[in-house]
Amino acid sequence: MPKVMGMNYQYKRLDNNNFTGNSLDDFVRHQTVTECWRKIDNDWKLVPNVYEENWSQELCREIAEDVVHHINLDQTGFGAFDGERIIGFATVSHRIFGAAARYVQLVCFQISENYRRQGIGKKLFSMACEEARRLGADKLYISAHSSKESQAAYRALSCTPVEEVNEGLAAAEPFDVQMEYRL
């Protein structure tokens, strides 16, 4: 797919006026994965793991409905828009957890395929961090996709391996890499 370049993207807090159950109908969540990070013998290693990840329209609608539900209940969401079309989004949980630090979770963080590598993720991540600070957190907790590319993106944002693992989040996504960002 051709990359879309533009500088007139708008960034907004998500609400029922700008985000609905159909908002992700044109969203392209595609990733070709060739290698993933895995913890082997207590050490992180990059291992071959070839697959394609694609969100169907049905899954896009399920995720959109879930985002709508949570932004009305217990999360704050931010979106990047190209006109009326959402091209990236991030959500932050309002629940603070952790014993040694005060964490809030970055629940969703996605950029539509044709819009990646343009700074959209960096801007949405910054907005999510600002919200986490406002909520009183010390750190943002991220259960991050383990692919080589996803991990490179998180590390470029200065995310590091988590110091205090949330066992529930780790168990829910056992192949994710648990990461954090100090606010």
Identify the meaning behind each predicted range.
Residues Y141, S158-V177:
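Conserved catalytic-core motifs of GNAT/GCN5-like acyltransferases
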Residues G121, F125, S147-S150, E167-E173:
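Short glycine/proline-centered loop/turn elements that form peptide/ligand docking sites
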Residues N18-F19, D26-R102, V107, S112, ...:
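Acetyl-CoA-dependent GNAT
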